[in-house]
Each structure stands twice: as C-alpha cells, then as structure tokens.
Amino acid sequence: MSPTVTVQLTDDTAKRFEGHAKLLAIGTATPTNWVDQATYPDFYFRITNSERLLEHKEKFRRICNKSKIRFRHLVLTEELLKKSPNLCTYNDASLNTRQDILVSEVPKLGKEAAMKAIKEWGRPISEITHLVFCTTSGVDMPGADFQLTKLLGLNSSVKRLMMYQQGCNAGAAMLRLVKDLAENNKGARVLVVCSEITINIFRGPSLEQDDNLLAQCLFGDGSAAMIVGKDPRPGLETPLFELVSSAQTIVPNTDSHLKLTLREMGLTFHCSRAVPSVLAENVEDCLVKAFEPYGISDWNSIFWVFHPGGYAIVDRVEERLGLGPERLRASRDVLSEYGNLTSACVLFILDEMRKKSKKDEQ
C-alpha cells in the first residue's frame, strides 16, 4: 500500500510565492587588453604564423568587416600567445594550457563584475545567501563558484551552484534560474556571475574549416554580475527590473546547426549558414507561447534584451517581426563594442538599457 502525504499551504508558504523577483544591481567587467576588429586579421595571421595564406587572410578580413563588430576585449595577449605556441596552431593538443589559464582567470574576471554589482547594491556582502556562477570553459573541481566565494569573502554557508558549458543560452537561463531561487527562498539575495574567456576557442586558421574563422572574429571576453531578490527594502535597495515570468522552447530538429565540442585541441565551433533563418522562422512561435498569457502580441510594444549571436541573426529577426530600429538597438551596440560575450551578453545589454533609460529620464 502506497503511503499518503497531505500537504497544506500555510499562510507563510503562500506569502513566499507572492511577488516577483527584482533585479537589484548589475556590474560588468572586461579585460584591459582589447583588439580593433579592423586590424585584427593582420594580428591573427601574424601571431599564428599563417601570413602565407593570403587568400584565407583576405577571406577573414571580409568576415571581420561584415561582422560590424568594432572592438573586442581579450585575455589573450601577444605575450601570452608567444609563451604558448600550441594555442596558435589549428589542432595541436593544447587543452592543458587552456585549462591552466582559464581556471585561474575566469574567477578573477568574475570578481571584478561582482564587486561592481555589490557596490551598486549597497548592502553588506554578508547578506548574499546564494551564488550562481556560469562559464562556458575552465571546468575544474572545486569550481569557479568556490574560488569566487573565497575571492569575495562570502559566508561559508552561501548556497552555491556552478553552471558549465551552457554557451549563449546561459544568459537567459540564468535569469530564469535566479527568478526561481529568489522567489522560493524567503529573504534570499542571489549573486549571479557570468564570466566568459574565449581562450578555449582561439586557434590558428584551417583551410578546411571556415567555421573556425567565424569563431575567431565573433567572440569577446567579459563578465557580468547581478544581484536579485524579492521584496526590496524601501530606502535600502533599488529595483532595476522585475522578472515577471520565464519560458523556454526547444525548436525540433535544429541541434545540428550549432555545435561546440570540447577536444584535446580546445573547444571546436560549428555554425551552419542556416542559423539566422532558422531563428527568424521560429522566433514568433516562441514569443506567442511566452506572451499570450499576458495578452501581448505587439512585439514593438515591449523592450527587447535580445542575445546578438551575430548581426545576421539580429537583422533577420528584426525583419521577420517587423521591429522598429530602436527595439534591438542595445543588442547591436553591445555586439559592436564587445563582440559576442556568450552568457554575459544579455546582462551587458540589460546594463546598457538601464543606462539609456536613466539618460532619457534626465
């Protein structure tokens, strides 16, 4: 005979589910080293000893020009690459070299963004109850969440969660996850950190793999942090955004279009030419499922924090939905000034939007 469990929703439990999570602070950080996209092809082919590949170099230059990215911040410097020549070939075994750099640098870059968010929040660091750390690379145990706990001096009792290898999906996924944590843990103040360093994907050119050139042109390094909680304390905390609902949709038969695979040579990248059109063709169905419960069907009536995988994606989605030029402006600006920051990108865009809103109010 199966046991029977009776659960009663008490007044205290009911209150726990009232109200939405609020984003209370945002901080961003980038490495001091940066590259100009206009001159990057010359640097890239020189540092990888590939200047003899003239046609390939010109092809890469065209890709960089079409990307509409102006600058990218990178941890990788010429000095570091000269010390690690195995990073500059296409397929030499180099995972150990990459890991040694990432395991050290990812938490440090995350700390910079976290400190800015904590400073803006204005509350004692001891009030942070949860930490969620996200990165696409640098897998280690204890993880970057543990290292950041030490770097920041968080309470030893802080509840930690480490998310590895989530890629561009992770920015929105972190918002969804932190909403659940903040709303279902009374008094929670959750620190979320997305720290991305693209060393794992850097490598020399290959005559057979054009996808690799796109990867070398597209991704930048950066970290972003946010503090989220429910029921902000008047006069002590200032909410920036309200997280009303979250949704996620898998588009069937699309998993072959975008793939990243961790190998001895680092993280390999495949992106089919169909990605922009596949996203554009399916985005409205996803929006309908997410916004229909709220009676919203005018896509120009809402503000957009759209992850800009690349300019072709932004252009196709904008055209498909008939969006005005200002709807995706923040996404375009972040892509132009930083490149694709994978999980950190969405938080950079949120930061850009709140800054613009504050400026408009003035």
Swiss-Prot record:
It comes from the Eukaryota. Gene3D superfamilies: 3.40.47.10. PROSITE patterns: CHALCONE_SYNTH. SUPFAM superfamilies: Thiolase-like. One of its GO terms (molecular function) is naringenin-chalcone synthase activity. GO terms for biological process: flavonoid biosynthetic process; polyketide biosynthetic process. The keyword Signal does not apply. Its EC number is 2.3.1.74. Pathway: Secondary metabolite biosynthesis; flavonoid biosynthesis. It catalyses: (E)-4-coumaroyl-CoA + 3 malonyl-CoA + 3 H(+) = 2',4,4',6'-tetrahydroxychalcone + 3 CO2 + 4 CoA. The active site is at C168. Keywords: Acyltransferase, Flavonoid biosynthesis, Transferase. InterPro entries: Chalcone/stilbene_synt_C, Chalcone/stilbene_synt_N, Chalcone/stilbene_synthase_AS, Polyketide_synthase_type-III, Thiolase-like. The primary product of this enzyme is 4,2',4',6'-tetrahydroxychalcone (also termed naringenin-chalcone or chalcone) which can under specific conditions spontaneously isomerize into naringenin. Belongs to the thiolase-like superfamily. Chalcone/stilbene synthases family. This is Chalcone synthase A. The lineage of its organism: Eukaryota, Viridiplantae, Streptophyta, Embryophyta, Tracheophyta. The gene is CHSA.
